[in-house]
Structure formats: C-alpha cells, structure tokens
Amino acid sequence: LADHWSGGKWSLRVEMKGDGLVKGMSRFSLQDPVTRNNTAEWLFLNNLRKENCMSVRYRFVNLVLNGKAMGIYAMEEHFSKEMIEANQRREGVIVNYDDYLLWKKFPEDMHSNIEWNSIFRSSLPDVRNNKRVNGSTDLTRQKYHAFSLLRLMQKSQCLASEIFSSEETGKFLALTRLWSAEKGLFYADINFYFNPITSKLEPIGFDGNPTRNSKAPYCYFTWGDIKDNWVNFALQ
C-alpha cells in the first residue's frame, strides 16, 4: 500500500539466507515507524506478549542502507520458526485466509461494493512458509488439521471453543479493543498459530495500528464489520 513507498523511507522486506539471523530474526520488514503509528504498535505488541498472547517482535533500529544513513526504522518480525520460538511455543504451522479474492479479483476501488460475508466464506485457507511445512511430515499433518479448523469456522459448524484456545484468544481480543488495534483483526490480515499440543488456534498480534482515538475507524466491537465475522464467531 502507498504508506510503504510514498515517503522518503521506503519499506523493505528482508529474508536471511541459510541460518543467518539479525536480532534473532530470519524474516522481517524495515519500515518508517509512522506506518505502524510510531511507538503505539511496539507498546501494543509488548502488552500482548506480557499476557502470553502471541505476537511478532517489533523494535526500532538505526538503518544504514548502502552506506547512506536512513534514520530510525521500525524492524517488524515476519512469520517464521524463530517467531514461534520467541513466543515460547512448540514448533507448529501458521495459517491464514488467502486474500486473492480481495486484492486480485477485486481492485481496491471496488471494495465498497463487495459482499464481505461471501468473500470471507469463499476464501481458501493458506499456510505461511509452505516450502518448509511441506518438507516435514509432522508439519504437513498440522497444516491440514489447521485448514479444517478454518473451514469449520467459515461454515460455523462447531463451537468457537473447539477451534480457539479460549484464554489466549479472549485476552487477545480484549487487548485489541483496549488499544484500538482492530485493524489487525481484518480477515485478510489475521494469522493463527496452530498449537500442536492443544490442537487449537491462537491469533497472532501483527499490524494492529493502534490509535489513541476511542472512535477508531476499525472498532468492530462498537459498530460491527461483517467482513470480520471470524471475530463474531470467536466471541461466542
């Protein structure tokens, strides 16, 4: 989106080769802190981790690019094995809903005309780091189990407590509301960790874009937003 390239601080996506890590991360983004509302995102994600909810790591760094000082950048972890380990969870898969129908089939200027309930129910499950997952029999089995949970949620064919880890999900949604960080709940942005011990999903904090305005434009708990009916399902 335009906020990642319109200014003087363009966003960068970094993937380390081999076993290389930077600050313990193998995959991360570097971007203007304004993109995630400056320190608000850092505070929100740290609050999640303090309450044992999953989130990506987020910190600020002084970036030098090809010898040029670029100033302070936000370093935002992307989904990886290291991210799971940093959250003190056992290795598992991270799944989400494919956003093809949203961005490829319907241009952004058509979004106001979309029937969001149909888009949500029609979106296909997807997995992060597919190559690594498919190289492991155990992770592949987890992937298909997690996919089945996502499909059950789309069809509302079971109880929310059978899909989500109730304590972590409840705290996650409560903190999201307290921080006005509902942007991260958008069905095309939310990612879930499949916990192989409980066989349930846990939401991952990412791109919440929290605001101090109590009437945040993403406040689904106040006026509802049908495109994010996974939230309505989880709140059951």
Label for each model-derived stretch:
Residues 1-34:
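Conserved oxyanion/phosphate-binding beta-strand-loop segments in alpha/beta enzyme cores
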Residues 25, 73, 85-89, 185-191, ...:
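Short, solvent-exposed loop/turn and secondary-structure capping segments
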Residues 76:
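Gly/Thr-rich phosphate-binding loop signature of adenosyl cofactor/nucleotide-binding cores
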Residues 80-178:
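ATP-dependent phospho-/nucleotidyl transfer catalytic cores
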